[in-house]
């Protein structure tokens, strides 16, 4: 990435060449004077730094052509010493540090300007400037030059075109250009004055001038009243056109000045206040004809003129005091109204001259002169073009009128220097009229100084960290115990003979065909004799269990693929099945689905896994202590071992606030673990909305499920295309679609959720169970009370995959599995698993996972960052929240003091009748109807049926 023109380029030499040409045109010594060496060194440093940057930014190819040999050499040198970044920052810092010096500025001057703009105390001048100001050189503009400046002819002045560059050692004498306006200026109009060097003068202090230092003069002449400021002074001044009388100009002109004239002594700066000429107007355009100067009487009282000018200047500076860069000790000026017309006044007066080195102050003076030229309302051309002829003419005129070279005493010494000035004579104050500019705003602030160069560019911000999710290692799980207890073959044979003998005693002849021992139970295959029905064997199971000395025997009437029955007897010693055994199994490792669940091991010891995406929902039920919560944890860990947050996101609802709260903070979560039932309803409602949104997207893309949708998005991304969102809020520029993760909703206790908001929750779960499979949203519902009021027919019909742990009755087993068998399970992880698509339950021993294992896996996932929660999941619908449809918080009926009594009556009597509540509570019909409707909104009673009756949904005290 070469910068082309940026390296060793003539662009950096233009300021120095321009300075040299301007000084030669002004008759100066072009390559000498203070500040020249600094400009030379700054130009050399800028060339080297820019060439090095050119070489460094050309793709780090230090052998290329970018930057030249010098740039490549410096880049190679500093690159080896500091590295590429260090060399780049070093060269950039050098470039920014010396760049202002190429143009004659310095960082100190720029910072001083910033402090002046902020009304900070002025920066004190260097001691060498103070010493230089104590012995100022004689002015280049003599008495004749001052008188000629007041004239209107300028006949002897030769015109030179082009803007003159000021000298850092000795400024050329300037003469103000002729008036070019068609009408004379109004009284009190402010014009900037250019000093003898060709630079605008600084405004003098606001305070009345102190007594001048007595300077012995061999010849005091009246011409001292119009003496120009010193050539070494870097101050600015303003000229006020006022109706007081001017001194009569002299007829004679002084001969041109020579270089030796700079060595003559000059008057102090304090005495230059009355030497202000009202005719110096360099900002006027040169297009209009000159205006004749105002005639002056032949004899003028110099002291009266001086005092009148001082009074007028003090009054004008009162207007400019708020604009000064720093406060100056002075008497309080008379308050004057703020001018409403725009006039750019840049007072920079100081009691002591605090000019920077003149090589640095020269560009500042030129910039301010340009700024004032732009502020002049009558200017019809850009500032440099309009000022250039006037500046050249003034220079030629004043150069011709400069005093003689110094072997002679300086004739321009003020007569007032010999004695203190008399008291000021009261005079009528002229009316100050400022030129108005239409369409511009009055600016009371100083012109903004040149902005400081930008600091060294900081290193570019690091790109966003791409999270490289790593699946947890199996070592985080506890390994299985190696000392497994195997059932000996002799024990199996002995038990087989004992089963046949006991059944023969009950006149049910059978033959034991075989036995297969597992980690928890042993299955004996029994072949009934001819004429023996299977029901006869099932009816003898309790007697057979008592005869064999076991807790329970489960009869499998039909074994798929075989003609025999199965008798499942528990082992004398149960083996613990660890989750690590199932996760390490090939069936789990080679499974392609991200939603594979490690269920456990079957009766023969083979690992059992299932795919939740094919289930597509799972219902888990079992009594307390049956291993239901451990199985849910094992299922969640199975998904955490197979899926990253980009593939699967989880929503966990834990009313007990114990089982699932340990997963708080893993990146898979879409929302914090929900423990409030109101937020649980909001989460399910959000899932329904997300399901509808995904269906619309899949329909627009022409795919049938979430896997097809993601495959189409990935194929487009690999081809370099973006699939636009067909439902974007900005159809003109739709955002591209991205892959969508699967969502698993885990509810640990459905019974509590149904009890609080049963009807609404049932509808939401039913909708998700019916349609959410293709949208990639799956449910895992767990409950410890598998009754019909919790697992309703609507939920059970849409969740074909079920897991039944030990239950207390055959009715609960039928509620879960639609068949018996769960009541005979052993507990502690012993389950009946009903796979999808089959009506045959499979006995599985669930994998055990300890709390320490869960914590280790959770900590592994937490190291990849915080989860990205969707706040809309738990926020809920504002309209629904306001109406209080779920919990009745927005209605007035629940606020009724009789609501609790009415609800208790309905739940106890199981009668949701308005008339019954009316009679029981002795209230009116309308009030009783509102109470019943509020119970319906809270999910206690069902909506009104066809015959007008309602059912009590929530369990009462009798259950």
Swiss-Prot record:
The keyword DNA repair does not apply. Residues 122-427 are annotated as: Disordered. Residues 605-814 form the FtsK domain. Residues 287-298 have a biased composition (Pro residues). Residues 126-136 have a biased composition (Basic and acidic residues). It is a multi-pass membrane protein. ATP binds at residues 625-630. Residues 220-229, 264-286, 380-403 have a biased composition (Low complexity). It holds the Pfam family FtsK_gamma. Signal peptide: none annotated. Belongs to the FtsK/SpoIIIE/SftA family. Consists of an N-terminal domain, which is sufficient for the localization to the septal ring and is required for cell division, followed by a linker domain, and a C-terminal domain, which forms the translocation motor involved in chromosome segregation. The C-terminal domain can be further subdivided into alpha, beta and gamma subdomains. The alpha and beta subdomains multimerise to produce a hexameric ring, contain the nucleotide binding motif and form the DNA pump. This is DNA translocase FtsK 1.
């Amino acid at each position: 990435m070469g910068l082309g023109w940026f390296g060793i380029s003539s662009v950096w030499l233009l300021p120095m060449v321009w300075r040299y040409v301007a000084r030669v045109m002004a008759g100066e010594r072009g390559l000498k004077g203070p500040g020249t060496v600094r400009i030379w060194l700054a130009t050399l440093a800028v060339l080297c730094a820019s060439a090095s940057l050119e070489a460094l930014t050309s793709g780090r190819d230090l052998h290329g052509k970018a930057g030249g040999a010098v740039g490549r050499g410096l880049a190679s040198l500093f690159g080896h010493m500091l590295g590429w970044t260090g060399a780049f920052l070093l060269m950039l810092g050098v470039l920014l540090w010396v760049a202002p010096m190429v143009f004659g500025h310095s960082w100190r001057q720029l910072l001083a300007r910033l402090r002046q703009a902020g009304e900070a105390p002025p920066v004190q001048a260097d001691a060498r400037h103070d010493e230089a100001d104590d012995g100022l050189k004689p002015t280049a503009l003599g008495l004749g030059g001052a008188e000629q400046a007041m004239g209107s002819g300028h006949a002897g002045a030769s015109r030179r075109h082009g803007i003159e560059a000021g000298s850092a050692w000795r400024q050329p004498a300037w003469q103000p250009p002729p008036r070019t306006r068609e009408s004379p200026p109004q009284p009190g109009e402010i014009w900037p004055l250019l000093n003898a060097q060709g630079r605008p003068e600084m405004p003098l202090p606001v305070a009345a001038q102190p007594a001048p230092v007595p300077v012995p003069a061999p010849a005091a002449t009246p011409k001292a009243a119009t003496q120009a400021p010193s050539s070494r002074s870097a101050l600015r001044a303003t000229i006020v056109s006022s109706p007081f009388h001017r001194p009569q100009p002299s007829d004679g002109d002084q001969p041109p000045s020579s270089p030796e004239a700079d060595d003559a002594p000059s008057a102090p700066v304090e005495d230059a206040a009355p030497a202000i000429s009202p005719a110096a107007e360099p900002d006027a355009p040169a297009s209009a004809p000159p205006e004749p100067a105002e005639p002056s009487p032949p004899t003028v009282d110099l002291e009266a003129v001086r005092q009148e000018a001082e009074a007028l200047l003090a009054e004008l500076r009162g207007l400019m005091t708020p604009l000064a860069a720093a406060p100056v000790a002075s008497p309080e000026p008379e308050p004057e109204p703020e001018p409403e017309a725009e006039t750019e006044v840049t007072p920079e007066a100081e009691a002591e001259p605090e000019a920077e080195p003149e090589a640095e102050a020269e560009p500042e003076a030129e910039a301010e002169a340009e700024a004032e030229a732009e502020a002049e309302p009558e200017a019809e051309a850009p500032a440099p073009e309009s000022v250039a002829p006037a500046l050249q003419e003034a220079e030629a005129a004043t150069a011709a009128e400069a005093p003689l070279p110094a072997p002679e005493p300086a004739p321009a010494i003020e007569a007032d220097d010999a004695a203190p000035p008399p008291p000021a004579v009261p005079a009528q104050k002229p009316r100050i009229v400022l030129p108005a500019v239409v369409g511009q705003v009055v600016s009371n602030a100083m012109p903004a100084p040149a902005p400081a160069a930008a600091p060294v560019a900081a290193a570019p911000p690091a790109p966003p960290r791409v999270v490289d999710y790593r699946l947890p290692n199996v070592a985080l799980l506890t390994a299985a115990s190696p000392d497994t207890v195997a059932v000996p073959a002799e024990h199996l044979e002995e038990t087989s003979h004992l089963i046949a003998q006991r059944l023969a005693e009950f006149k049910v002849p059978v033959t034991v065909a075989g036995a297969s021992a597992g980690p928890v139970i042993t299955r004996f295959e029994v072949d009934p004799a001819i004429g023996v029905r299977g029901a006869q064997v099932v009816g003898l199971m309790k007697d057979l269990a008592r005869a064999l000395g076991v807790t329970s025997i489960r009869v499998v009437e039909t074994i798929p693929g075989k003609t025999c029955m199965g008798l499942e007897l528990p082992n004398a010693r149960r083996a613990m099945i660890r989750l690590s055994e199932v996760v390490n199994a090939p069936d789990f490792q080679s499974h392609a689905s991200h939603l594979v669940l490690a269920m456990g091991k079957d009766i023969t010891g083979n690992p059992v896994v299932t795919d939740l995406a094919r289930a597509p929902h799972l219902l888990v039920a079992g009594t307390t202590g049956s291993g239901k919560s451990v199985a849910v944890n094992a299922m969640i860990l199975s998904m955490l071992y197979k899926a990253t947050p980009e593939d699967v996101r989880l929503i966990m609802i834990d009313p007990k606030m114990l089982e699932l709260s340990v997963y708080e903070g893993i990146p898979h979560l879409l929302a914090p673990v929900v423990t409030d039932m109101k937020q649980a309803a909001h989460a399910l409602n959000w899932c329904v909305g997300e399901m509808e949104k995904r269906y619309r997207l899949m329909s627009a893309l022409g795919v049938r499920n979430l896997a097809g949708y993601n495959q189409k998005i990935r194929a487009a991304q690999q081809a370099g295309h973006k699939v636009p969102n067909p439902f974007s809020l900005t159809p003109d520029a739709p955002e591209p679609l991205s892959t969508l993760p699967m969502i698993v909703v885990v509810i640990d206790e459905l019974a509590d959720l149904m009890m609080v908001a049963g009807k609404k929750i049932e509808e939401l779960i039913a909708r998700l169970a019916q349609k959410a499979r293709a949208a990639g949203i799956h449910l895992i519902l767990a409950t410890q009370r598998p009754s019909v009021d919790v697992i309703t027919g609507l939920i059970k019909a849409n969740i074909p995959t079920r897991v039944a742990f030990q239950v207390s009755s055959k009715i609960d087993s039928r509620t879960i599995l639609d068949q018996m068998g769960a009541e005979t399970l052993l507990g502690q992880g012993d389950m009946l698993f009903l796979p999808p698509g089959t009506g045959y339950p499979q006995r599985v021993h669930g994998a055990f996972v300890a709390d320490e294992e869960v914590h280790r896996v959770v900590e592994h996932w937490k190291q990849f960052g915080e989860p990205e929660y969707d706040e809309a999941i738990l926020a809920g619908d504002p309209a629904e929240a306001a109406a209080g449809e779920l919990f009745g918080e927005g209605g007035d009926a629940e606020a009724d003091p009789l609501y609790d009594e009415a609800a208790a009556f309905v739940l106890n009597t199981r009668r949701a009748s308005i008339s019954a509540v009316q009679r029981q509570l002795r209230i009116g019909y309308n009030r009783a109807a509102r109470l019943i409707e509020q119970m319906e909104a809270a999910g206690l009673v069902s909506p009104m049926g066809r015959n007008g009756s309602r059912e009590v949904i929530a369990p009462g005290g009798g259950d």
